[in-house]
UniProtKB/Swiss-Prot annotation:
PROSITE patterns to which the protein is assigned, alphabetical: DHODEHASE_1 (PS00911), DHODEHASE_2 (PS00912)
Name used for this protein in its record: Dihydroorotate dehydrogenase (quinone)
The species this protein was found in: Coxiella burnetii (strain RSA 493 / Nine Mile phase I)
SUPFAM superfamilies linked: FMN-linked oxidoreductases (SSF51395)
Cofactor note: Binds 1 FMN per subunit.
Role played: Catalyzes the conversion of dihydroorotate to orotate with quinone as electron acceptor.
Localization: Cell membrane
Active-site residue list: S175 (nucleophile)
Cofactor(s) named in the record: FMN
Keyword annotations of the record: Cell membrane, Flavoprotein, FMN, Membrane, Oxidoreductase, Pyrimidine biosynthesis
Family: Belongs to the dihydroorotate dehydrogenase family. Type 2 subfamily.
Catalysis performed (reactions): (S)-dihydroorotate + a quinone = orotate + a quinol
Pathway(s) annotated for this protein in UniProt: Pyrimidine metabolism; UMP biosynthesis via de novo pathway; orotate from (S)-dihydroorotate (quinone route): step 1/1
A Pfam short name: DHO_dh
Length: 347
């Protein structure tokens, strides 16, 4: 409710400034227990996926908390799970500013952040300090200076360092803002990457006596043939989940809007049809063998339910949260809970 009045003021600020201010305000509210009090009244819809019990199926997508500095506060908003990152082995500044652009008429964003983060070692320290229990995953990527032929080393480095502190790890091979990264979605690179990471997973499971699922995050701009190739490799290597989708290079539906020509990945409402199509195609190839996490253009409970009906097991929010505020989480969970009760004939 408060966010409705704050948003016009926040949108007058440069997007990264507004982002930092919002997160710092969230930390202040958390210190005064307002979030904890809100969470006590929050509806729950427990969902078991990948052998993990999620309090509800609505998660936070990677990108909002790149360095894991606000995990307790974000879990306090009522998310069933949060994903931090993307993180790389070494710190890197990302692309030059400005690198986030609003398209309010389309309820969309364009970003070209470029995996800016403080490095995996810093994130591990943040994970050690967190106090709130909850499901936390980490999105991992490669450093800008790492050639594709050695990209697997960056993913393996991050996976090993994070393994004992997280509930799952997402392999990000689909950001449009790191040159050549999306080539890792091709069979040539992906088969080798998955082979190496699954070998590491087996070794680390023996070492830590826990299994950390591996998810794969893919782009919305893939052809059906490319999606089928990825699905086949995911099945062959027994990847535990697929996150669909990342931001898009397309500008469909936004072409004439201010900032639409800025380079970067498009997120928000225009992405929803693409996300839905990819989820449907993935589910047609995977069935129920590999769960799908849907992200992209979710602004309502109806959006979330549509993606679940199409085959997704969980959903994630990002741009919808920026436009609608924290109440969106509660609204979606309530809608999904009522939808299930209606299907089960519960009055």
């Amino acid at each position: 409710m408060i966010y409705r009045y704050l948003r016009p003021w926040l949108f007058k600020l440069e997007p990264e400034t507004a982002h930092a201010l919002t997160l710092n305000c969230l930390k202040w509210f958390y210190c005064y227990w307002l979030i904890n009090r809100r969470l006590q009244r929050f509806p729950q819809k427990p969902t078991v996926v990948f052998g993990i019990e999620f309090p509800n199926p609505v998660g936070l997508a990677a990108g909002l908390d790149k360095n894991g500095e606000y995990m307790d506060e974000l879990l306090g908003l009522g998310f069933g799970f949060i994903e931090v990152g993307a993180v790389t082995p070494k710190p890197q500044p990302g692309n030059s500013k400005p690198r986030i652009f609003r398209l309010p008429q389309a309820r969309a964003l364009i970003n070209r952040m470029g995996f800016n983060n403080l490095g995996v070692d810093y994130l591990v320290e943040q994970l050690k300090r967190r106090k709130v229990k909850g499901i936390v995953g980490v999105n991992i990527g490669k450093n800008l200076t790492t050639p594709l032929e050695k990209a697997h080393e960056d993913y393996q480095n991050c996976f090993e360092k994070l393994y004992s502190y997280v509930d799952y790890v997402t392999i990000n091979i689909s950001s449009p803002n790191t040159p050549e990264l999306r080539q890792l979605q091709s069979e040539r690179y992906l088969a080798d990457l998955l082979t190496r990471l699954k070998e590491d997973q087996r070794r680390l499971e023996d070492q830590y006596h826990k299994r950390v699922p591996l998810f794969l995050k893919i782009a919305p701009d893939l052809t059906p043939e490319e999606i089928q190739t990825i699905a086949t490799l995911a099945l062959q290597h027994r990847i535990e989940g697929i996150v669909a989708t990342n931001t898009s290079c397309s500008r469909q539906g936004t072409e004439k809007l201010p900032n639409a020509n800025e380079a970067g990945g498009l997120s928000g409402k225009p992405l929803f049809p693409m996300t839905l199509q990819v989820v449907k195609q993935l589910h047609s190839f995977l069935g129920d063998e590999i769960p799908i996490v849907a992200v992209g253009g979710i602004f309502s409970g109806e959006n979330a339910q549509t993606l679940i009906n199409a085959g997704a097991r969980l959903v994630q929010l990002y741009t919808g949260l920026i436009y609608e505020g924290p109440e969106l989480v509660k609204n979606i969970v309530e809608f999904l809970t009522l939808s299930r009760q209606t299907r089960e004939g519960i009055n």
